[in-house]
């Protein structure tokens, strides 16, 4: 039996490797493993809770330098007076707002989910939108 979905996932994983984006490649390979093993029974949970769990992990990673003391309070306070930091804050707010609209769009217009997901993966892979630290 020819599995088109598996072929698409393999292609996207290859794109992740070709673009040296291990975040995309590893994420898709994990999903492939889930798909081809008995773990596939977890897909409903992954689909329902995966985004929330991912955002929690992302937030932990972003906040870790503050919690560990690596980012001193003086640097954090300075970010509110430096123009580059203020621009970074504004961009962060805008990106968060866009992300929220994308999640709402996915819920309200499910027919757009496939295009939005493929576009996100391609954007990350080709334009290095999210990269793991080396």
From Swiss-Prot:
Primary location: membrane
Superkingdom, taxonomy of origin: Bacteria
UniProt keyword terms in alphabetical order: Cell membrane, Membrane, Transmembrane, Transmembrane helix
A GO cellular component annotation in the UniProt record: plasma membrane
Membrane topology type: Multi-pass membrane protein
Family named by the database record: Belongs to the UPF0756 family.
Protein name: UPF0756 membrane protein YeaL
Record lineage: Bacteria, Pseudomonadati, Pseudomonadota, Gammaproteobacteria, Enterobacterales
Originating gene: yeaL
């Amino acid at each position: 039996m020819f599995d088109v979905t598996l072929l698409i996932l393999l292609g996207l994983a290859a794109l992740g490797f070709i673009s040296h984006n291990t975040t995309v490649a590893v994420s898709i390979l994990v999903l492939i493993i889930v798909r081809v093993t008995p773990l596939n029974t977890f897909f409903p949970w992954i689909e329902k809770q995966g985004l929330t769990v991912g955002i929690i992990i992302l937030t932990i990673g972003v906040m870790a330098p503050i919690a560990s003391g690596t980012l001193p309070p003086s640097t954090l306070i300075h970010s509110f007076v430096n123009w580059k930091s203020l621009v970074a804050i504004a961009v962060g707010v805008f990106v968060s707002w866009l992300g929220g609209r994308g999640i709402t769009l996915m819920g309200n217009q499910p027919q757009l989910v496939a295009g939005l997901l493929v576009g996100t993966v391609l954007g990350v892979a080709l334009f290095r939108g999210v990269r793991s630290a080396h």
